[in-house]
């Protein structure tokens, strides 16, 4: 039946007149529709291939995608072709998708945000409680310097001042020296030296250098032993190193093994750290600043008390007598019983050339002294006629007399030092034999303090007797 219907339709179509052909527009519309479909297919072929995984699926999997920017660009391009209405639809679609993405959070993200919020809250509470604690009234065990000019009270101004002072003290704790007084009180007057001499170690008494062949080597400056030994009879010598204790202590022990010349050792840990430099603050020495003198090779070391300082150029390891030329001036200061060394140091315009300037002054004084003595001899005609004034009666310059007496004392002092060295060696040998093990500590075999003192006294007597025997043997050998 279907085939018969098709044949009848074809025959009827052939018999239609030309002026009645009104169905042709339908055929044309079909061809236009087919052409648009073909163009759409061509455009789809030219487009880039799209992935099966869309942005929603990637976001659920936890992958970060740059879909917002790319999508907005593609949609803006399509909107330009399609019209303003499509642009509005795309923008609204983007906003809606953005809201969905922002609202989509995993359980892990929610926990992280919750923990972060708790952390911020607890941090703020901790800061607030810390500020209130630092603003409290002064405690009885806090230093008076910290409480200076800020009384107790809970007014906002006083609380802020106390909080600020305590906050600043946290940082000054690491900048200030470890103790307010770096040295113990001076001994009583009969045993006290008139002045205190602070000496640097690096590039003043010793010089260290590194070479590829031998590594680190430390050289002792020529005349250091004589300088320390001679001035120790006039000064309380304090060695103040610019290096840390773990490096400089061994060098200091080599300079003075029995502590006969150097009274105290200070190191970089005892410096004041200020403005990026380490400063040797003489006011922390527990001594009268008018009787303290410092010799250093770094001007930053004495920047707080430049009126107490003598500057020397850093020693480069070559032989020189720069250190020994300071002895006459330092000896003059100590023997004149001055109450304040600062005016004398200030009388020298340049503290870098004090030895030369002092030598010129001494030469002028010596010439004046000789002229005065010559005038006295000329006036005494009777002694001149008898020839008494010309034979053995020429007076000596006072500074020369002081130097001669100092040399005698130095010789006697060095003899005592050599004897003490021998005695100290014997003491070290005896102390090395007397040891206690960890087993003795655990079992309680350690003697009481009274017994230890008794043992030490007995050992000391044995050392004294042994030392006297050695002296007798040396005397007998010397007489032979």
From Swiss-Prot:
InterPro entries (UniProt xref): FCP1_dom, HAD-like_sf, HAD_sf, TIM50
Span list, region Disordered: 63-107
Residues in the Mitochondrial matrix compartment per record: 40-118
Transit peptide: 1-39
Subcellular location: Mitochondrion inner membrane
SUPFAM superfamilies, per the entry: HAD-like (SSF56784)
Swiss-Prot/TrEMBL keywords: Membrane, Mitochondrion, Mitochondrion inner membrane, Protein transport, Transit peptide, Translocation, Transmembrane, Transmembrane helix, Transport
GO cellular component: mitochondrial inner membrane
Residue intervals annotated with topology Mitochondrial intermembrane: 136-480
Domain FCP1 homology per the UniProt entry, residue ranges: 190-333
Transmembrane segments: 119-135
Example of a GO biological process term: protein transport
Membrane topology value: Single-pass membrane protein
Superkingdom: Eukaryota
Subunit structure: Component of the TIM23 complex, at least composed of TIM23, TIM17, TIM50 and TIM21. Interacts with preproteins in transit.
PANTHER family from the UniProt entry: DULLARD PROTEIN PHOSPHATASE (PTHR12210)
The family this protein is said to belong to: Belongs to the TIM50 family.
Task of the protein: Essential component of the TIM23 complex, a complex that mediates the translocation of transit peptide-containing proteins across the mitochondrial inner membrane. Required to direct preproteins in transit and direct them to the channel protein TIM23, and possibly facilitates transfer of the translocating proteins from the TOM complex to the TIM23 complex.
Record protein name field: Mitochondrial import inner membrane translocase subunit TIM50
Annotated source species: Kluyveromyces lactis (strain ATCC 8585 / CBS 2359 / DSM 70799 / NBRC 1267 / NRRL Y-1140 / WM37)
